Amino acid sequence: MAAKQGSFRHGILEKRERLLSNNGFSDFRFTDIESNDLLENENCGRRTRLCCCCSCGNLSEKISGVYDDAKDVARKAWEMGVSDPRKIVFSAKIGLALTIVALLIFYQEPNPDLSRYSVWAILTVVVVFEFTIGATLSKGFNRALGTLSAGGLALGMAELSTLFGDWEEIFCTLSIFCIGFLATFMKLYPSMKAYEYGFRVFLLTYCYILISGFRTGQFIEVAISRFLLIALGAGVSLGVNMFIYPIWAGEDLHNLVVKNFMNVATSLEGCVNGYLRCLEYERIPSKILTYQASEDPVYKGYRSAVESTSQEESLMSFAIWEPPHGPYKSFNYPWKNYVKLSGALKHCAFTVMALHGCILSEIQAPEERRQVFRQELQRVGVEGAKLLRELGEKVKKMEKLGPVDLLFEVHLAAEELQHKIDKKSYLLVNSECWEIGNRATKESEPQELLSLEDSDPPENHAPPIYAFKSLSEAVLEIPPSWGEKNHREALNHRPTFSKQVSWPARLVLPPHLETTNGASPLVETTKTYESASALSLATFASLLIEFVARLQNVVDAFKELSQKANFKEPEIVTTGTDVEFSGERVGLGQKIRRCFGM
């Protein structure tokens, strides 16, 4: 039956005819068996060639991807080795220690019977050998103490178990439970945190000796052989680590504190310079908002100082194990004072973090108001960073402070900023909303009260309105024609900045509604936001002054460290009429005045 022209079936048949005319490249099955076989053979051949090509292409892409990944890993490994060559040396040292222990075991020295327990020597080298000598000594002591105490306790329990006869296995099992419970509970005590590894070794050794000795009946032999092999591995590890390119935890702690001083100084300068340049982030990085590592130099500087607490505590706990070495020539060296000094520095770094928060804030002060305090803000930032860098150099050189007061210049800069704030404080607040300034002894119009400024007030008149205000408000010249119209014009002619936009520029409120005093909501809200943006400048300035106040704690902590660590006296260099104390310059006249207490 012929299909009706224009129907769906008619369209399908036409499509089939076109495909048949194109040598049968169709997915339809035909009734001609020979033609079907021919078409299927051709299609299979093409599909096979296509699959082979695709497989080869995918394989080459995978090989290329593996090669690129391997090359990237090799590049990163090379960069890591170049950045800190000590890592390469440490890797070579641990390989050498393992080789020495293996040779001793192969040649069955010093005792041929110990070869069957040789795995304990290898495990000791792998576990005890640490990056720094202090960490190696700490772990070696913990392992030795845990092994000795566990061995003695296991031997005692083994002797007691023989008294229980058939209940010997039950007694050993109960003793393992009790010892495991007590040791685990004790290592959770805060003061026992430093011996956590020793408790683990204690449990492992106790269980191993008790179970192995129970099977073989040789408790004493197992305990002695284990102790000797652990001593062998620990001795080889300590010897290789101490006598071949030693890496000291105390030196790392010393360098870390110096680095923190430089980083905080860099962040402080970056905050002040960025704020005065009206630096604006087009988009605040999400890593900064979530307090993660970021490449922002200002953020990276103070964050590294704040986040170094755990590293400092770890290095200090290892440094106290190290013997006198290098410039640290005394026993009981005051490593804790390094951490204390760094803690005082972190107290200042928190203020720098708050300064950076002012730059990231959405409420920003206009540029013209920042420029009013530019010189004073700049000087405080420069002097504060200079002080931190100088203290960092003193720590690095291990020198005491000279006779010059390091805080003099930065305190002077902070006082100048404080005086400028007191003088220009009307720029930091909305003075029209001051309650104390709006009080009058008798009711009168605001215009009449302001007009008293130009004439001498008679005795029966109220004093001028600014007599109730602060000294800063009194120096503000308020024009007698100031009113709603002038305030609107001032808002309309506010300059815009391409670097950073202050918060009031974002207002979009309808100005047609009137309030009870005749001012529109737009003007009232604009005044509110303008006052908030000005207060952001006051916040930044007050944080700088707070930073200067906290520097006293840093200087005091450094003086305490320099006394306990017996830092050397600063070198005195005389040049003409000036006397220089290891980088500090003091005029001769100033030195004479200080000698006489002037």
From Swiss-Prot:
This is Aluminum-activated malate transporter 9. Signal peptide: none annotated. Vacuolar malate channel. Has a higher selectivity for malate than for fumarate. Also exhibits a weak chloride conductance. Expressed in hypocotyls, leaves, roots, flowers, sepals and stamina. In leaves, expressed almost exclusively in mesophyll cells. Keywords: Chloride, Ion channel, Ion transport, Membrane, Transmembrane, Transmembrane helix, Transport, Vacuole. Slow activation by external aluminum. GO terms for biological process: malate transport. The keyword Membrane applies. Belongs to the aromatic acid exporter (TC 2.A.85) family. The keyword Ion transport applies. PANTHER family: ALUMINUM-ACTIVATED MALATE TRANSPORTER 10 (PTHR31086). Disruption phenotype: No visible phenotype. Coiled coil: none annotated. It comes from the Eukaryota. GO terms for molecular function: monoatomic anion channel activity. It comes from Arabidopsis thaliana. It is found in: Vacuole membrane. One of its GO terms (cellular component) is plant-type vacuole membrane. It is a multi-pass membrane protein. The chain crosses the membrane at residues 88-108, 117-137, 144-164, 170-190, 194-214, 227-247.
